[in-house]
């Protein structure tokens, strides 16, 4: 994990509203189907893909929005877009294989949640967090916005 400063950039794609409890049950989970839709629409895997978490109702426990897509313009009509704010983020990283993307993502999020439960951990701003998937390098990075830096 490292502290990084990111400049603002725009991500375009498909958006859903969900909540953590719904994502724990296969019959109500929406994030996996969202990614399936995006990759079906794109047909060719992009070099970089983004999963953006925003509009937190009450931290990560209530409703929040997830946008899955690409930096810049999405190649299909009626796409949603948002600007990831520039600022200070904690960056958590892991390697993955094509067959282990979901498992790697869940394990890395578990690492994030455990880190922020520690005494003295920086305060999350709950404005915008995002996942960055590198198809070529098979890397996953999760960026968590933090306050006071």
What is each PLM-predicted segment?
Residues 1-149:
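A solvent-exposed interaction/effector surface
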């Amino acid at each position: 994990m490292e502290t990084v400063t990111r400049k603002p950039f725009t991500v375009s794609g498909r958006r859903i509203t969900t909540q953590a409890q719904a994502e724990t049950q296969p019959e109500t989970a929406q994030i996996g189907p969202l990614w399936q839709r995006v990759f079906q629409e794109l047909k060719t895997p992009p070099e970089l893909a983004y999963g953006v978490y925003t509009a937190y109702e009450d931290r990560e426990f209530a409703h929040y929005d997830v946008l899955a897509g690409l930096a810049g313009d999405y190649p299909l009509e009626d796409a949603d877009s948002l600007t990831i704010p520039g600022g200070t983020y904690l960056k958590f990283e892991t390697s993955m294989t094509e067959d282990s993307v979901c498992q790697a993502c869940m394990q890395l999020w578990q690492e994030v949640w455990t880190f922020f439960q520690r005494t003295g951990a920086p305060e999350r701003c709950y404005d915008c967090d995002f996942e960055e998937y590198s198809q070529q390098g098979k890397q996953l990075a999760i960026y968590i916005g933090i306050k006071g830096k």
